[in-house]
From Swiss-Prot:
Residues 368-381, 389-404 have a biased composition (Polar residues). This is GDP-mannose 4,6-dehydratase sdnI. NADP(+) binds at residues 16-21, 41, 64-65, 86-90, 161, 187, 192. It catalyses: GDP-alpha-D-mannose = GDP-4-dehydro-alpha-D-rhamnose + H2O. Its cofactor is NADP(+). It comes from Sordaria araneosa. GO terms for biological process: 'de novo' GDP-L-fucose biosynthetic process; antibiotic biosynthetic process. Keywords: Antibiotic biosynthesis, Lyase, NADP. Substrate binds at residues 90, 157, 186, 192-200, 219, 225, 303-306.
């Protein structure tokens, strides 16, 4: 067990704990005997899981990187030896649409966290890890890129990370922090979000393998990346903070592959060979033997500025602490595709709550093995009730439906009819609304949740969100953009297909919508390269 002065276990604080990297880092730290604290944003998809006992050794705290006061409150109330700063707005394409938000979270968020640690006098005791990116190098850097390669970022995301990199190094030099920047090249896994291109590829290949899709679209097939496995990289991250002094390290495989290579490797897992024809925007991938077009290029998915040749060298990390990647591209892609095939078969491909790794599945007799610190305004278990707005409906004292099969912590079913209107006075720039649709529960009712950030308060004059959802059938996969119908005001009614047409397993889908300053709806695709300005008005759904 990792201990401090043989008196207590080591303790770590992780921002971004519910993301891909956070999940693997938690696995590593718990195995080494750490006590783990994590920062989570109080959204509905997390609240549902926080109603369950967590794995031993994990304590979660509500907050985000834009709130210095909450960070101060959390870090002054716990004893921590290592801080792993993983939280970020990490979509490159999204950063072109939201540069201010991206810099607020990534750049200023890092400064807020470092300044809180400095004010608390922890600069000599706490070791700090900052997760930066190979996107720092831009598109002109010679390959391979190392810690000494000049940085020339070409996206708002990369610019925000350059500030994060520089301010971390500055606090190391100016205030004596044991602080390290991890310049991590692309790293993927089955836990990668479905909005990233690699996971988009593996989920679509899985759907094709299961007969639920015919083809899909991608952007620049020529873009080259150095892809590794998140588990390998998080082991390297932990090793960085065990060194006598803080420094900056590149973690990379040293092998470059194109998006086209990744596609071929994914189809190879399901026994399909892809043959390419055409060039640039006219290029397509065809299945050898059947002639079916499986991949098309859509220029809408191109980034405004593309880093086409990122290739890293981890020579410094190998020399300093012996780090080397264990996964090859082929073994990484195989693990991802096989995992996604299982998710398709289980009906959970588009689950918005991929947090099973947090839950203690061995907990019995109601024993609580976790702690969740939250403010009164963000209580785990809050749910939306059409009759009286928001109320607490947690494991104890929750309002139950007539059907006792509704699990504890599950949000209450949608009543016969719920009308959701755009919120009044939405600030310019939009407001995200995330909807969890859990299909039919055992009572045969649709379950709906709203994100905590969209919870009505005393200043609201309406409820957020404009969306209608269709029930999935045995022949209709739950694909987010296929199931969204939007208008200025839409009613949601429970779907009424016979039980035989609904898959027995739970199905979920994440439907993200933006309402702009004029109350119009912006469609957000479940892919990284959406167009944020596109306004849509689709027909009102026909209710059963």
């Amino acid at each position: 067990m990792a201990t401090v002065d043989s008196q207590r276990p080591k303790s770590a604080f992780i921002t971004g704990i519910t993301g891909q990297d956070g999940s693997y880092l938690v696995d590593i730290l718990l195995e080494k005997g750490y006590q783990v604290h994590g920062l989570v944003r109080p959204s509905s998809q997390r609240r549902q899981f926080l109603s369950h006992p967590l794995r031993r050794g994990i304590t979660l705290h509500y907050g985000d990187m834009t709130d210095s006061a909450t960070l101060m409150q959390i870090l002054s109330s716990i004893t921590v030896d290592e801080v792993y700063h993983l939280a970020a707005q990490s979509h490159v394409a999204v950063s072109f649409q939201t540069p201010l938000l991206t810099c607020d979270i990534n750049a200023l968020g890092t400064l807020r966290l470092l300044e809180v640690l400095r004010i608390l006098g922890l600069e000599k005791r706490v070791r700090f890890y900052s997760a930066v990116t190979s996107e720092l190098f831009g598109n002109e850097a010679p390959a391979p890129q190392t810690e000494e390669t000049p940085m020339a970022p070409v996206s708002p995301y990369a610019v925000s990370k350059l500030f994060q990199y520089a301010i971390t190094a500055n606090f190391r030099e100016a205030y004596g922090f044991h602080a390290s920047n991890g310049i991590l090249f692309n790293h993927e896994s089955p836990r990668r979000g479905t909005t990233f291109v690699t996971r988009k590829i593996t989920t679509q290949v899985a759907l094709i393998a299961c007969g639920l899709s015919e083809s899909f679209e991608l952007g620049n097939l020529n873009a080259t990346r150095d892809w590794g496995h998140a588990q390998d990289y998080m082991e390297g991250v932990w090793m960085m903070l065990q060194q006598p002094e803080g420094s900056d390290y590149v973690l990379a495989t040293g092998q470059a592959s194109s998006v086209r290579d990744f596609v071929e490797a994914a189809f190879k897992v399901i026994g399909t060979k892809i043959e390419w024809s055409g060039e640039n925007e006219s290029e397509m991938g065809t299945e050898v033997g059947t002639g079916k077009v499986r991949v098309r290029v859509n220029p809408e998915y191109y980034r405004p500025v593309e880093n086409e040749n990122l290739l890293g060298s981890a020579v410094k990390a190998k020399a300093a602490f012996g780090w080397e990647p264990k996964y090859t591209l082929e073994s990484l892609v195989e693990e991802m595709v096989l995992s996604d095939i299982e998710l398709v078969k289980s009906g959970k491909m588009f689950s918005t709550t991929n947090l099973d790794w947090l839950i203690d599945r061995s907990a019995e007799d109601g024993e609580t093995t976790s702690a969740v610190n939250s403010s009164p305004s963000s209580t785990a278990g809050d749910t939306y009730k059409a009759s009286d707005g928001w109320s607490t409906s947690g494991a104890e004292g929750s309002e139950q439906t007539e059907c006792s099969s509704v699990a504890e912590g599950t949000d209450i079913p949608v009543p016969e009819k719920v009308e959701l209107l755009p919120s009044a006075g939405v600030e310019e720039g939009g407001h995200d609304v995330a909807i969890d649709v859990l299909g039919k529960d055992d009572c045969g009712k649709v379950v709906l949740t709203l994100d905590e950030q969209d919870k009505p308060n005393e200043n609201d004059e309406g409820h957020l969100a404009v969306v209608a959802v269709e029930e999935a059938t045995a022949t209709t996969p739950f694909v987010g953009t296929d199931l969204i119908k939007m208008d200025s005001s839409i009613s949601i009614e429970p779907a009424t297909p016979s039980p035989s047409t609904v898959a027995e397993s739970e199905r979920r889908v994440n439907l993200t919508i933006t309402i702009d300053g004029e109350g119009r709806v912006t469609k957000v695709y479940n892919v990284p390269d959406f167009t944020a300005e596109e306004k849509v008005t689709l027909p009102t759904p026909v209710t059963a």
